[in-house]
Amino acid sequence: ENVAFPLKQRKIDTKLINERVINALKSVGLTGYENRKIQELSGGQQQRVSLARSLVKNAKILLLDEPLVNLDYKLREQLREEFKNLFSKGLADETILIYSTTDPRETMELNGEVIVLDEGKVLQVGPAKEIFENPNSLKVAEISNDPPMNIINSKISKNMINFEDISIDIPIHFKDIKDDELKVGLRSSDILLNEKGHEFEVELAEISGSETLLHLKKGSTKLIMSIEEVMNFKIKDKVKIDFKIDKAYAFSANGKLISSPFRSKNV
């Protein structure tokens, strides 16, 4: 009844309504739940009922506004996978799907055409992979990464990247950069523990699933690094780290992309 409601409002033939309801429920993995009351369903199942109700209308435009935002972690992962299958196989060819999310992982996994918005302004448009690999500005780099990309205020001198008391050989894709001052971008996964590395202080340690996030500080430089295992750290612990500098991004002082590990360009 819930899924069929928009079709009944249009006074569509009962047989056609039943066919479309069955197909919509099948698309969202709810075959066999046709006669359940909505209060008998879990939160995730109720979310899928809402999606089926949207699909059954065969609308030309389907808008999903953060459909996973209020669900627990396991259910989000499950539905994200189901959405992937649905969007690749279960939508009519003429249907345009607009999926709103603040989670970069959803953007990458659904892998469609992406519009990056900030306060109503379009910052970048393109395939998800292109935006992830080549964010055109600092703001896009922050929005399209979780945790946000680390940004390090740096100076370039004698083919070295310099910040705080640290000097690192510039990567090959920085060779043609003329700017003396840069904002160097590094993802949290491109910072590594290294006993022979540079000393930073732990400001915060978070356990997220099977991953550890360390918030680090050295002088005025603050970084977030991700470790793909659960590790115990305390605030003010000293850790030594190194950088996958070949994965670094270069942004100009005004925040425009100069060079990425995937593609170089002049501002």
Regions found by a protein language model. Name each.
Residues 105, 129, 138, 150, ...:
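Glycine-centered loop/turn positions within well-structured domains
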Residues 133-158:
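C-terminal boundary and immediately downstream tail of ABC-type ATPase nucleotide-binding domains
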Residues 77, 151-153, 193:
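Generic structural "secondary-structure junction" signal
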Residues 1-136:
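ABC ATPase nucleotide-binding domains
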